[in-house]
């Protein structure tokens, strides 16, 4: 969430920067008047409280002196009623301001290319060698069904479309990747956690999923607690420290979390709905960092390298792109996408994102640090990154490591986890 005072004091530049997202933010022009009305109400309330306190003292003094308190008590009651009315007005005014700020996205970083969608993202560099096949490569669905390691038909019988049953070496490959990723990031100083998969409304708001993306997540409607299914480990992991204040010498705090994620994926169509590229339920390894504001972009660059290491060790060809302003996530100031080359698409496809939300999520979650320079509490910066999406990594391995006979060579780094060098 953006800071109200900052938005009001810098309104033209804030709107100009936000409109690089190719959206209309004219509604923010309401904020200066709302902020002024709020300020006036606060002053009136402060004055009335002072009058009410003075009146209460007079009541006490007259009562102690055994004088008639009828008129003074009547004045006190009038002041109390007026105060309650003003406090209700203030509550409504603050809710109006809150509603505006809660749907307003983060300010994009100045380094981002200006654009309308992912077509305007900027390729930064490529890594790894794209394989030249001596045969026509198959897509992961064909390969997996021939090997009987992914079962879409039975998953559909259980749950409907957008689900899969991993079986045999398919299940073992998924598990091996999770273990490999968790081990790798753990060695790099990320503390391993397994958070809850059922999440409350406050947690979903804190990371920016609500209210904007209500239609993209799963809500447990029989719950009295406004519970949601985990859409990404980013949500529960960040909320570990909601309403907390860090000591500065503890930063950065780094977590790696493995969870199953659940998303509606509304509006998905075309080739992406074939196979496991876009699922309602999928496994993901997520990286989270709570950083000092002064070095959060250095931490972001290091997190990118940490995510890249997974692809490098798996020897998968990939590229890094910088997201344009039009493709940038709601809560993020800057995002790098990792895209792996998929032979069936003959192009690079997203396998992970690494982002800096600056203090946007920290403000919503009220996560701060004590600044020793001035002894004041300041919002930390929060980073999140994929480390990686497990299902899409399975796709990349099946397609890039396929053999002409339909078998799959297991990447060398996974062989100790899987206990074999070939899937057949």
UniProtKB/Swiss-Prot annotation:
Binding residue positions for L-serine: 232-234, 286, 386
GO MF term set: ATP binding; serine-tRNA ligase activity
Gene3D superfamilies, per the entry: Bira Bifunctional Protein, Domain 2, Serine-tRNA synthetase, tRNA binding domain
Known catalytic reactions: tRNA(Ser) + L-serine + ATP = L-seryl-tRNA(Ser) + AMP + diphosphate + H(+); tRNA(Sec) + L-serine + ATP = L-seryl-tRNA(Sec) + AMP + diphosphate + H(+)
UniProt: ATP binding residues: 263-265, 350-353
Keywords: Aminoacyl-tRNA synthetase, ATP-binding, Cytoplasm, Ligase, Nucleotide-binding, Protein biosynthesis
Pathway: Aminoacyl-tRNA biosynthesis; selenocysteinyl-tRNA(Sec) biosynthesis; L-seryl-tRNA(Sec) from L-serine and tRNA(Sec): step 1/1
Subcellular location: Cytoplasm
GO CC terms: cytoplasm
Entry EC no(s): 6.1.1.11
InterPro entries hit by this protein: aa-tRNA-synt_IIb, aa-tRNA-synth_II, aa-tRNA-synth_II/BPL/LPL, Ser-tRNA-ligase_type_1, Ser-tRNA-synth_1_N, SerRS_1_N_sf, SerRS_core, tRNA-bd_arm
GO-annotated biological processes: selenocysteine biosynthetic process; seryl-tRNA aminoacylation
Complex and partners: Homodimer. The tRNA molecule binds across the dimer.
Domain notes: Consists of two distinct domains, a catalytic core and a N-terminal extension that is involved in tRNA binding.
Function per UniProt: Catalyzes the attachment of serine to tRNA(Ser). Is also able to aminoacylate tRNA(Sec) with serine, to form the misacylated tRNA L-seryl-tRNA(Sec), which will be further converted into selenocysteinyl-tRNA(Sec).
PANTHER family in the record: SERINE--TRNA LIGASE, SERYL-TRNA SYNTHETASE
NCBIfam families hit by this protein: serS
Entry similarity comment: Belongs to the class-II aminoacyl-tRNA synthetase family. Type-1 seryl-tRNA synthetase subfamily.
Name of the protein this chain belongs to: Serine--tRNA ligase
